């Protein structure tokens, strides 16, 4: 063991070295040493509690961090997902009108005049243009000599669609149109919520056809026509006759649509007027029923077509009435009951 004097000498020597290690410019200032916080260990002291809690803390801290990151991700993702859902809802709402119809140019010779004007009027109705918009698109669609006919009209006449139409037809002639098999004036008196449905299809689109013996013509809603044809205006033919509803008003008709109706495996040719005549998507009137010699039995709720008997579903009936299927009986001796397209 060393003597107390030797220990004192070593301590003074260390203090002397520390003093000489300080920069000359830094005067020695005597500062009181701040006491260490009571919660921290002193030098050389180990707290057993910290050793025991260290592994636990090393697990909890990353877990909490991951939790906060996950919550932040969810908070950022929810508005985006909500936005996507809202957009999807908007698209589904817009599904009924997916097309922005634009008239093709007309120079007087590229298209038969009355067919072009009919197509233009259909586009006007589908797009719900006002009068000013209709006239603007009319002028912008004209080319060449057709535009010359328009420019030679007075400003007042240019603002009247009927006058412009008459001038174009007079300038380029109207070829004879094929006569329609329909009468000149027809009264459309549907059953107004009464009647029976047939379940079928047009193309690949499922349709509930209202069988209405009170309607002289068959009608489909423009939305159904657009869904089946993808808005193909070439599928519409002009309708020159007049159809009046029960109150005497004239029905606005976009055109005549020749298509095929599928009832089970049976296909029938049918001609529909495309018009927003009622809330029904499709109405089968007496014209189609008579063309195919349909036999309606309202007592037993059946409709017989080409040897096939189909169930009629009551309007406003319960869902239980709409069980699978339509075809309930077939006459095996009937050659007309085959799958070919019936005329």
From Swiss-Prot:
It is found in: Membrane. Changing residue 199 to E: In ADLI; impairs filaggrin cleavage. It is a single-pass membrane protein. It comes from Homo sapiens (Human). Pfam families: gag-asp_proteas (PF13975). This is Retroviral-like aspartic protease 1. Keywords: Aspartyl protease, Autocatalytic cleavage, Disease variant, Glycoprotein, Hydrolase, Ichthyosis, Membrane, Protease, Transmembrane, Transmembrane helix. Residues 207-288 form the Peptidase A2 domain. Gene3D superfamilies: Acid Proteases. GO terms for molecular function: aspartic-type endopeptidase activity. Glycans are attached at residue 276. Undergoes autocleavage which is necessary for activation of the protein. Homodimer. Changing residue 314 to T: In ADLI; impairs filaggrin cleavage. Its EC number is 3.4.23.-. Residues 77-343 are extracellular. The chain crosses the membrane at residues 56-76. It is linked to Ichthyosis, lamellar, autosomal dominant: An autosomal dominant form of ichthyosis, a disorder of keratinization with abnormal differentiation and desquamation of the epidermis, resulting in abnormal skin scaling. ADLI is characterized by onset at birth or within the first months of life, skin scaling on the entire body with relative sparing of face, anterior chest, and abdomen, and palmoplantar keratoderma. Patients may manifest mild erythema and moderate pruritus. GO terms for cellular component: membrane. Its main location: membrane. Residues 1-55 are cytoplasmic. Protease responsible for filaggrin processing, essential for the maintenance of a proper epidermis organization. Residues 1-190, 327-343 form a propeptide. SUPFAM superfamilies: Acid proteases. One of its GO terms (biological process) is protein processing. Expressed primarily in the granular layer of the epidermis and inner root sheath of hair follicles. In psoriatic skin, expressed throughout the stratum corneum. In ulcerated skin, expressed in the stratum granulosum of intact epidermis but almost absent from ulcerated regions. Expressed in differentiated areas of squamous cell carcinomas but not in undifferentiated tumors.
């Amino acid at each position: 063991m060393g003597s107390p004097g030797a220990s004192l000498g070593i301590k003074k020597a260390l203090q002397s070295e520390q003093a000489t290690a300080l920069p000359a410019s830094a005067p020695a200032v005597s500062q009181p040493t701040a006491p260490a916080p009571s919660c921290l260990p002193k030098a050389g002291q180990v707290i057993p509690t910290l050793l025991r809690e260290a592994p636990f803390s090393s697990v909890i801290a990353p877990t909490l961090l991951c939790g906060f990151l996950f919550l932040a991700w969810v908070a950022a993702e929810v508005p985006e997902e909500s936005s996507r859902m809202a957009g999807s809802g908007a698209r589904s709402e817009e599904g009924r009108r997916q097309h922005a119809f634009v008239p093709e140019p007309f120079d007087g010779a590229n298209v038969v005049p009355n067919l072009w004007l009919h197509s233009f009027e259909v586009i006007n109705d589908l797009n719900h243009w006002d009068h000013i918009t209709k006239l603007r698109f009319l002028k912008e669609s004209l080319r060449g000599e057709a535009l010359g006919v328009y420019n030679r009209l007075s400003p007042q006449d240019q603002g009247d669609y009927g006058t412009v139409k008459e001038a174009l037809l007079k300038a380029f002639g109207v070829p004879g149109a094929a006569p329609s098999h329909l009468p000149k004036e027809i009264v459309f008196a549907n059953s107004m919520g009464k009647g029976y449905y047939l379940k079928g299809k047009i193309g690949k689109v499922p349709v509930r056809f209202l069988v209405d013996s009170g309607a002289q013509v068959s009608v489909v809603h423009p939305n159904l026509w657009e869904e089946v044809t993808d808005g193909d205006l070439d599928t519409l033919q002009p309708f020159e006759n007049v159809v009046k509803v029960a109150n005497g008003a004239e029905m606005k008709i976009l055109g005549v649509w020749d298509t095929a109706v599928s009832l089970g495996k049976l296909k029938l040719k049918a001609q529909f007027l495309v018009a927003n005549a009622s809330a029904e998507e499709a109405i089968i009137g007496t014209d189609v029923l008579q063309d195919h010699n349909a036999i309606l039995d309202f007592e037993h709720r059946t409709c017989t077509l080409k040897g096939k008997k189909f169930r009629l579903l009551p309007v406003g009936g319960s869902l239980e009435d709409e069980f699978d299927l339509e075809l309930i009986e077939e006459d095996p001796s009937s050659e007309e009951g085959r799958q070919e397209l019936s005329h």
